[in-house]
Amino acid sequence: MPEYLSVSTLTKYLKMKFERDPYLERVYLTGQVSNFRRRPNHQYFSLKDEKAVIQVTIWSGVYQKLGFELEEGMKINVIGRVQLYEPSGSYSIIIEKAEPDGIGALAIQFEQLKKKLGEEGLFQDKFKQSLPQFPKKIGVVTSPSGAVIRDIITTVSRRFPGVEIVLYPTKVQGDGAAAQIADHIRLANERSDLDVLIIGRGGGSIEDLWAFNEEETVRAIFESRIPVISSVGHETDTTLADFAADRRAATPTAAAELATPVTKLDLLGHLQQQENRMSRAISNRLSYYRERLNKLTQSVIFRQPERLYDGHLQKLDQLNLRLKQKIREYYSEEKQRVKILQHRLEALNPHSRVQRLQEQTAQLERLLRSNMAVIYDNKVAQVRRLSEALLMLDTSRIVARGYAIVQKNQKVIESSAGIEEKDELTLLMRDGQLEVEVKHVQRKEI
């Protein structure tokens, strides 16, 4: 007669077989994530393909070390063990390790972190800072022994000698590298004299470059008040640090060139151009004023200076007439005032007082006449002197006295200096002018 087993007995037997079977102690599965809903601690979901579904469990400690976020429909490769749950008689896979199928976990983590930080605005162009044209000090966050720092020093020294490089020796890969990079970026920002900051390292695998994809590094770059140039890996490598930096350089040499956009030779050439422009401007200005001076010397005032006084002579005549008119008016007013006083005196009547006042009035009248005559004579003499002074400047008066005025090319000649034999001169005389040719020049020592 057959022996019937209880459900629990069979379940325990199957569990023992699962646990002792070497093929089930460590299984390698590939499948698509299904029914995933993230929970605070342990994660429970399904792994399926076209024909079957298996329940899987990831304990919280393992899930936190995955390095990427599980998503519904994601195809993953897992390593785990089979476990049977006795109360329900169901089995599941306890995952010990997982990674995306076809693409590494780091690549998934890269895209997920890129999306997260991008949505926060860390990569937007509006936050990018411009690089200085003439830096005095350049900070470098990199390994002290790699080729990066040597290339940067060589390039900067060649392009603009005298620029100081401040090195922050930094671990650029492995555990703790991201934290040290971020710390040194913040340390550099404590200085007020750094103009630009270069962070970078040489080429390597995605694992080697991963410190520059860490969130801590990216946020430190974004928060830097000093403009940051990222130079990580080779030209084909791209890190999140490149997106957050103000500028990205393909090589350390290119980073040094970005940090020194103007070379010493460029600056010297620019200064030479400015000097040439200034020289041309000064030369043009001198030519302009020289031309103006030539025009002035050919003007009527210089060729006929007597015209300069015509207006003044006319004004002097007008002033003379006004002066005479004022004297006459003043004399008439005073005379009228005296008459008024005489009438008042006559109206007061004692005779003696009237007589005394009449005498005083007569004396004042004589004094007034005398003063008016003196004033008039003085003004007339002053006008005469001014007229004679102006007449002395009149060339027609000079030639009227028997002198001649010598001109060369319509310019008055005051000395024999500058006169050579066969020069043609013009002699202005009282009744005409003579055109003469110099036959001999005899100069006197003065």
Curated annotation (Swiss-Prot):
Pfam families: Exonuc_VII_L, tRNA_anti_2. Keywords: Cytoplasm, Exonuclease, Hydrolase, Nuclease. One of its GO terms (molecular function) is exodeoxyribonuclease VII activity. Its EC number is 3.1.11.6. GO terms for cellular component: cytoplasm; exodeoxyribonuclease VII complex. Bidirectionally degrades single-stranded DNA into large acid-insoluble oligonucleotides, which are then degraded further into small acid-soluble oligonucleotides. This is Exodeoxyribonuclease 7 large subunit.
